[in-house]
Amino acid sequence: MAKTIEHFDLVGLEEVITPEGLERLVKSLNKYTNHTWDYHISPFPVGTRKYKEYYAYVWKKDRVTFLSSEGFYPDREKLFIREPYGANFQIGKFDFTFVLQHAVYGKSETERRAEAFQLVKVYRYFQDRNKKENDILIGGDFNLSAFDEAFSSLYEDKDQIIYGVDPRIKTTIGMKKMANSYDNIFLSKKYTEEFTGKSGAIDFTNRQYKVMRNKVSDHLPVFIIVNIDRDDD
């Protein structure tokens, strides 16, 4: 995993089961790459009684500045199986709020679509929370393609929200082939003009799907590239 992560300046992580596991990853990054890495983990795990996970971020200290935590989305309506979590960062001149969400999988797409339809509330919460910051990125495993109609409420928002990663790119790893396009990063076309339009996923499988999903991850990391020489807030 460290060999894959080293390609990025800042990485959002989900399905972090223990803080100790994250610490081991950061130690590996510091040992095997030419950069010094730091991390931030959510103060507690979220999920169900049977399964909970942390959200986390890791970054290159010479490239990225961690500004502050925005905390969890206050899910008073119980809309999400795992409340999304946000934190503020700066890379070069570009500062932004990076929100992570790991959506429900559930028993049917109906459950997943119900969460996706409410994602606009998460965007609006973090957008309204910090009056000085307009760049809100929402990344994660949404267990749906960004083409799905359930994201229509997000796309219809006045801030012109778009997906950053082409949904035709499959990001989940099956036993014998790539399976689904579940991972993406949503952002505002209106505000985040720093987005270059370049994005994708790093395929580390070498077609060894079963081995890699068991030893590394069953998801490919997705990414967007932004211009860090400007900030339009």
Kindly give the residue locations of the regions a language model identified:
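His/acidic metal-ligating clusters that form di-metal
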Residues: R113-G139
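Structured beta-strand-rich core segments of catalytic domains in phosphoester-bond hydrolases
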Residues: I17-F94
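Stable alpha-helical elements in mature extracytoplasmic
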Residues: M1, G12, T18-L25, Y54, ...
